[in-house]
């Protein structure tokens, strides 16, 4: 949508740079201005609709982050590729309500899933005795949202995290 708006502005600029000899009554210019205004309204409507859907999807979880599964069972590397292709991220809960929203997905499907824990994480939810590097280099969350060290080769539920900053 932004590409269309930019293209319209470019056309308007080209038209203005070429002068008004070809359009002495300003009909073409007015038509371009009307089209641009229509595109701006459409963009505003789409943005509003998108935000409404996003707010509705995140309402129940109390988190602005969405945790979505395709119900596949994969290892960590496959998860990374799937989330990247979907323009999402491997889950990385930064707050308790993020972790609860993530755990709700796992509980609903009765499966565990990978997550990543940043070096400077302010929030963690390690299970007792964790992290345990001997268990593996990756981290998984159980259906209650507790975190456990695990092998990156384990096949777990594919869950990707999506968040929107506008």
Swiss-Prot record:
The keyword Transit peptide does not apply. The keyword Transcription does not apply. Pfam families: Lectin_C. One of its GO terms (molecular function) is phospholipase A2 inhibitor activity. It comes from the Eukaryota. It is found in: Secreted. PROSITE patterns: C_TYPE_LECTIN_1, C_TYPE_LECTIN_2. Residues 46-161 form the C-type lectin domain. GO terms for cellular component: extracellular region. Glycans are attached at residue 122. Residues 1-19 form the signal peptide. Keywords: Calcium, Disulfide bond, Glycoprotein, Lectin, Phospholipase A2 inhibitor, Secreted, Signal. Disulfide bonds join 83-160, 138-152. Expressed by the liver. Belongs to the alpha-type phospholipase A2 inhibitor family. This phospholipase A2 inhibitor binds directly phospholipase A2 in the presence or absence of calcium. Homotrimer; non-covalently linked. This is Phospholipase A2 inhibitor.
């Amino acid at each position: 949508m932004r590409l269309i708006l930019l293209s319209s502005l470019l056309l308007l600029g080209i038209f203005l740079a070429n002068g008004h000899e070809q359009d002495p009554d300003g009909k073409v210019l007015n038509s371009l201005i009307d089209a641009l205004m229509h595109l701006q309204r459409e963009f505003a409507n789409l943005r509003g609709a998108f935000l409404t859907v996003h707010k509705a999807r995140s309402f129940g979880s109390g988190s602005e982050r969405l945790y979505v599964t395709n119900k596949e069972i994969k290892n960590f590397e496959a998860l990374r590729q799937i989330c990247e292709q979907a323009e999402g991220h491997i889950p990385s809960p930064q707050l308790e309500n993020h972790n609860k929203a993530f755990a709700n997905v796992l509980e609903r499907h009765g499966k565990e899933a990978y997550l990543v824990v940043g070096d400077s994480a302010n929030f963690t939810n390690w299970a007792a005795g964790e992290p345990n590097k001997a268990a593996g280099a990756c981290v998984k969350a159980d259906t209650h949202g507790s975190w456990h060290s695990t092998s990156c080769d384990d096949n777990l539920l594919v869950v990707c995290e999506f968040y929107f900053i506008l």
